[in-house]
Amino acid sequence: DYKLHKLGYKLIDPSVIFGLPIELLAKTFDGKFHTSPNTAMKSLWLNGDINDMRLNVMARTKVLKTYVTINNIAVAFVAIHNAIAMVHALEVSKINQRQGFGKKIMQQIAGWASLNGAHYLSVITVHNNFPAKSLYEHLKMSEVGNYHYRIKL
């Protein structure tokens, strides 16, 4: 990282990784799980901060995965590898934020992941996404790591 910095690569998207043992969150399992996203889910993502490139990465994922929604108000993607469920692209519609949908979808994900062999739940967000960080901290998830990208200027 230091060498990249010295070569003129700029730090972008500093991120924090949260995690917890899945049994601490897996309480329910009644969400709508899909093998591919429906039109409403894609629309919610595209109106948020998830672009087509990210959606294509999700589609190409080769491990056990699912797309989850709560009435197309909240959506997320989760994939399991080595008993770790990694949540990606959690999005709650702007008008429905701060109403508990983030917590509910994370519980749904944990329930699905637990039934599919995961023992640990993890999620990554950029450092300045304070609503997401607040949700994960409220869920008693611990900060377990950090990372960032670098790009050449």
Residue ranges of predicted features:
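Acyl-donor-binding surface of acyltransferase catalytic domains
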Residues: 1-35, 150-152
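Conserved GNAT acetyl-CoA-binding A-motif
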Residues: 113-124
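A conserved beta-strand-loop-helix scaffold within acyl/acetyltransferase catalytic domains
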Residues: 56-94
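A structural microfeature
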Residues: 13, 72-74, 145
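Internal catalytic-core helix/loop-beta-alpha segment
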Residues: 36-64
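Short acidic/polar active-site loop segments enriched in Thr and Asp
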Residues: 10, 83, 119, 142
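Conserved acetyl-CoA-binding loop-helix of GNAT-fold acetyltransferases
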Residues: 92, 98-111, 115, 134, ...
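Conserved beta-strand-loop-alpha-helix junction that forms the acyl-donor binding cleft
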Residues: 1, 123-133, 150-153
